[in-house]
């Protein structure tokens, strides 16, 4: 039964724990006066600045300002959650954790999540068994160079073309359709029919850092678009918080000196197969703040691997922008850029383990990449150009929380632009600098803008839609434009963006559509269809809610006729499913 740990027990546990003894089993402490010192485990340093005070049962680092009690230390050093830290201390002292029962609502949520974890595990096992029963799927994996040990290690699976075929093969268990929809296995279309989201795909189970399977990735066996899909957001799966391969890495390499980040599931598996056992993936998306935090709690050095083309450089720049605010002293971000038309899977099979390790060794430090990128098109003989680029560089460097790292970067920048005293840059007060060098100020994201942008950039999406005539009478800003765009895309099959845009030339909407046509919405190609349909579903929900409110108001004022009552009942029933 889930429970709350009493505060009294936590206080007692801290009281009974000698912080010196616990830390000394992990770090060599040396007594200096009343305190104990060692090199800080959370940043690189030559002179020990990590101090532990016996009287205060507290640690503090003068270099990176990290501090806390023994629970904080275990959470940061061992990458444990708060509850896991309490359990670890209780285990050390041989104590049983007393529990306070929580309320019924929290109990229900706990049991619900526990059941979903169990369901995803069972489904993953079902998929895994099925891959060995489906010859063409099994051969596909082997032909990709992935051996049987990796299939088992990553628990790879296969979902057949029809979910019910899978159930027939495994007659022991019949699964509840509603629960399968909750974890994103089954999906219901706008027209109301249900199908297997991952049908005819290789399955990659996604685990959280505790080993629970929280979602799935799926790779098509043919050229079906999209090539890769992920589970949707659910109660247990939040894409921006998960990293593929993290759990598997921590099992064999709990304290990696560095972590290599690649884009694809197969890239992770290939590199691990070639003994690069510190490789994980961001599920095919741009890195999030939460993922960066998790990575830096696990290792001091993160290496991102990208294609060497323009899109790879742009992705690396976006990653750098997100990473800067997490680079404390002792932490580092590096980049590897592969040759064009190569990915980690293909190149390690061509070059082998040793040559790929050389690429890792030659990875570019974030500071070098930052300045190289900014000054790539800057004329260093032009004072105005140097000044403009420097203001952008200064504002970026100031995002870095590590003061020592920040100082070194200011020194490097000052030498590059010919300023002898780097303190001039540090003391220069620069505000409101636009640091985006690849993109202009982003367009404000609204659901209707997203679907219009996706459609204008991918006209084929219109062919995936059912009839939308029932939406024509509703008034939502941008809806009429979207419906007109759908009509034009359907009337021009196999058309491209330029062709569709041309239909709007000399119309008031043309400029807006042109902006959306080049809008970097940062949605990966394999996710576009699902994202588009999900966004359209949100719009339909907004329309239903708006109509519901109008009918309720009308009912209170003048009453409803039989047809309107039935409409309200239907809307209430539909929205109750959400």
Swiss-Prot record:
- The UniProt record gives the binding positions of Mg(2+) 1 as 263, 307
Instruction: Give the record's cofactor note, including how many are bound.
Output: Binds 1 zinc ion per monomer. Binds two Mg(2+) per subunit.
InterPro entries the UniProt entry points to: DNA_helicase_N/primase_C, DNA_primase_core_N_sf, DNA_primase_DnaB-bd, DNA_primase_DnaG, DNA_primase_DnaG_DnaB-bd_dom, DNA_primase_Znf_CHC2, DnaG_bac, DNAG_N
Q: What are the GO MF terms of this UniProt record?
A: DNA binding; DNA-directed RNA polymerase activity; zinc ion binding
A Pfam match is DnaG_DnaB_bind
Zn-finger region bounds: CHC2-type: 40-64
The GO annotation for biological process reads: DNA replication, synthesis of primer
Asked if the keyword Magnesium belongs to this entry, the reply reads yes
Instruction: Give the domain of life.
Output: Bacteria
What chemistry does it catalyse, as a reaction equation? ssDNA + n NTP = ssDNA/pppN(pN)n-1 hybrid + (n-1) diphosphate
**Cofactor(s) this protein requires:** Zn(2+); Mg(2+)
Q: Which family does it belong to?
A: Belongs to the DnaG primase family.
Subunit structure, as described in the record: Monomer. Interacts with DnaB.
Task: Quote the PANTHER family the UniProt record gives.
Answer: DNA PRIMASE (PTHR30313:SF2)
Q: What is this protein called?
A: DNA primase
* Phylogenetic lineage: Bacteria, Pseudomonadati, Pseudomonadota, Gammaproteobacteria, Enterobacterales
| The gene coding this protein | dnaG
